[in-house]
Amino acid sequence: MSEYTSSFLRVMSERNFIHQVTDWKSLDALLSEKNMVAYIGFDCTADSLHVGSLVQIMMLRYFQKCGHRPIVLMGGGTTKVGDPSGKDDARQLLNDNEIEKNKQGIKTVFEKYLNFGDGPSDAIMCDNDEWLSLSLIHI
């Protein structure tokens, strides 16, 4: 659709990132009116990401370039508990040192594509492993 008013949806459409959108007019209006926040999560099962993650990384990059704030959610907690994602065998569990090494490797990938900091459109990186230590009082 070439009628997008938001720069993000326009770029995504021009680059054929969009297949379908539910209520694109409302989404376009939101993205045009104010800065938005979006996240994508990545498990820490390896010290780098494979090419299958490139679409998500580029979406976050364009999201930021259009003035919005991307969040990279590292799946340290998900990696600890395992997530077979419909596979027949459970994922091999990694120890804390391996997970930390993998997180650092993945972080270097994102630092090539996103600007991290405290500004309104600077990317944030957080880790769902931090949520595992929260008590009900903290939630």
Question: Predicted segments — roles?
Answer:
Residues 1-44:
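Non-catalytic terminal extensions that flank enzyme cores
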Residues 12, 50, 125:
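Divalent metal-coordination and catalytic microenvironments
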Residues 79-100:
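Active-site-proximal loop->helix
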Residues 26-84:
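N-terminal catalytic cores of NTP/NDP-binding nucleotidyl/phosphoryl-transfer enzymes
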